[in-house]
């Protein structure tokens, strides 16, 4: 049982490491677009947009570094929980104010999808998953190489699954348009 919990912790750490690195890379590659996305949320004063657009990707990378270092993994996952909660609250605030966002700023794949319930559910699930990961980090014990590989593979597969679901969600509107013309 303890080894299964350790494998689950590794999978969660692998998932958030990959997901946050992907999100940070997206933000760093096109900082102007990310700054525009932050402006679209209408939560920050104009003077804070550029610094936030520059700082957030590095915060995500720092969290990844904390997650992958065993001694700081729980701290990294708790910081991840905080970051995911902030992102969730920002989306909720925007939706409650009836502001339509075309891009949540998360990672580029969902750029064609208007931010809505899907994004709220996804981020709520990420908040819960990061709490579980932080909790499981306390149960981590010595594990075989096979267990480490299994955890990393499960985390990678989960990352690909999430990115695929993002792609399907963003293409749903496009597919509906194609199907309605047949």
Where are these regions (language model features)?
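Membrane-interfacial helix-loop segments of redox and metal-homeostasis proteins
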Residues: 2-182
């Amino acid at each position: 049982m303890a080894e299964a919990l350790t494998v689950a912790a590794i999978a969660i750490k692998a998932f958030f490491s990959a997901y946050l690195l992907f999100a940070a890379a997206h933000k760093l590659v096109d900082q102007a677009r990310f700054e525009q996305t932050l402006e679209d949320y209408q939560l920050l004063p104009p003077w804070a947009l550029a610094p936030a657009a520059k700082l957030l990707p590095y915060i995500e990378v720092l969290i990844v570094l904390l997650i992958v270092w065993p001694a700081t993994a729980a701290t990294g996952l708790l910081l991840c929980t905080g970051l995911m909660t902030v992102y969730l609250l920002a989306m909720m605030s925007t939706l409650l104010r009836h502001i339509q966002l075309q891009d949540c700023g998360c990672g580029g794949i969902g750029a064609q999808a208007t931010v809505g319930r899907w994004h709220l559910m996804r981020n709520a699930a990420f908040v819960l998953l990061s709490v579980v990961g932080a909790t499981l980090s306390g149960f981590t014990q010595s594990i075989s190489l096979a267990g480490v590989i299994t955890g990393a593979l499960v985390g990678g597969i989960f990352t690909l699954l999430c990115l695929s679901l993002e792609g399907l969600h963003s293409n749903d509107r496009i597919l509906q348009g194609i199907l309605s013309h047949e």
